[in-house]
């Protein structure tokens, strides 16, 4: 376990298929999805956008991962957004014992560089409202709120 605020020596690299089990374990524990992650989910992220899938590791242990995907909004949406190419952050997870050590920021920096190489000029993401720390981090990185996703149960 890392001490809070103390730097952790990590390296960020592209995901490799032999990372699957460690990434799956991390996704099951820490990713904010409505359904439990499966090997098929992680495999699909990799097969659809391998250039946008990164892991952070220290001593051969994966401490976090991020995967993104190029989006294809209609031309009208691109015009409204004043954008040429859009991508989304599909998921980001960091082991809870290693949070607040810059790992998420390092992962996102690698992802943003990969996006820039593909001439992507706008990045979107969804964050559950309960993920307050994530919202703060994204705000510090320059993300701005654009919409809110709401729901109401009709069965009660």
Q: Where are these predicted regions, by residue range?
A:
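A short beta-loop-alpha structural element at the N-terminal edge
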Residues: 9-23
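Conserved beta-strand-loop-alpha-helix junction that forms the acyl-donor binding cleft
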Residues: 124-134, 151-155
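Conserved beta-strand in the GNAT
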Residues: 55, 61-70, 88, 93
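Conserved GNAT acetyl-CoA-binding A-motif
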Residues: 115-127
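Helix-loop element at the rim of GNAT/NAT acetyltransferase active sites that forms part
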Residues: 24-37
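Active-site rim helix/loop that mediates acceptor-substrate recognition in acyltransferases
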Residues: 34-55, 67
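Conserved acetyl-CoA-binding loop-helix of GNAT-fold acetyltransferases
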Residues: 94, 100-113, 136-140
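Conserved active-site alpha-helix within GNAT-family acetyltransferase domains
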Residues: 105, 117, 129-147
């Amino acid at each position: 376990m890392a001490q809070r605020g103390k730097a952790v020596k990590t390296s960020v690299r592209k995901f490799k298929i032999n990372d699957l089990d460690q990434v799956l374990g991390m996704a099951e524990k820490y990713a904010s999805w409505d359904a439990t992650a499966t090997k098929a989910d992680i495999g699909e992220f990799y097969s659809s956008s391998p250039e946008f899938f990164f892991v952070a590791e220290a001593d051969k242990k994966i401490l976090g991962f991020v995967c993104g995907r190029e989006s294809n909004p209609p031309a009208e949406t691109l015009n409204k957004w004043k954008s040429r190419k859009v991508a989304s952050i599909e998921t980001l997870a960091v082991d809870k014992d290693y949070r607040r050590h810059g790992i998420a920021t390092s992962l996102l920096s690698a992802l943003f560089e990969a996006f820039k190489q593909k001439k992507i000029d706008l990045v979107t993401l969804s964050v559950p409202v309960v993920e307050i720390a994530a919202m703060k981090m994204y705000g510090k990185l320059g993300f701005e709120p654009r919409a809110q996703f709401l729901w109401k149960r009709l069965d009660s």
